[in-house]
Amino acid sequence: MEKTKLYECTVIIDGGLQDEAIAAAMEMVQKVITEKGGSISSVLEVGRRKTAYPINKKTIGYYAHIEFTAAAPVIGAIEKVLRYEEDLLRYLIIHLTSALLEMRKRVEKYSVVIGSPEDTAAAESDDSGKDAK
């Protein structure tokens, strides 16, 4: 049995599709990964976003990231299936090295989520200082 590695697959699905079609495309991508021997560890659906440039004359895409473990030969089989899926505007599969995982941990440690209690408290303290003047 081959050694498995951690990968991340980022997909951009046609944002002009109905929600049901997008859900079906996401399900198809996950099904392909598991059928080819991968094991999905997490799925992050970012949602509809404007693309940086038109892709096949489309400017809105539905973005999603899927983390999974698989053996190296499985990646080619997954890409072969995704390549011919018409609802996918783009896809990219990368190997998550230890350096990338360490960088991700540092970013998460020092990032502040907008709308978090810390942001709200900081904004309220700034507003109260302005009213006193």
Swiss-Prot record:
CDD domains named among the record's database cross-references: bS6
GO biological process: translation
Coiled-coil residue spans: none
Molecular function terms from GO: small ribosomal subunit rRNA binding; structural constituent of ribosome
Gene Ontology, cellular component aspect: cytoplasm; ribonucleoprotein complex; ribosome
Record-linked Pfam families: Ribosomal_S6
Described purpose of this protein according to its UniProt entry: Binds together with bS18 to 16S ribosomal RNA.
HAMAP family reported in the protein's UniProt record: Ribosomal_bS6
Family: Belongs to the bacterial ribosomal protein bS6 family.
Official protein name in the record: Small ribosomal subunit protein bS6
Gene name as annotated: rpsF
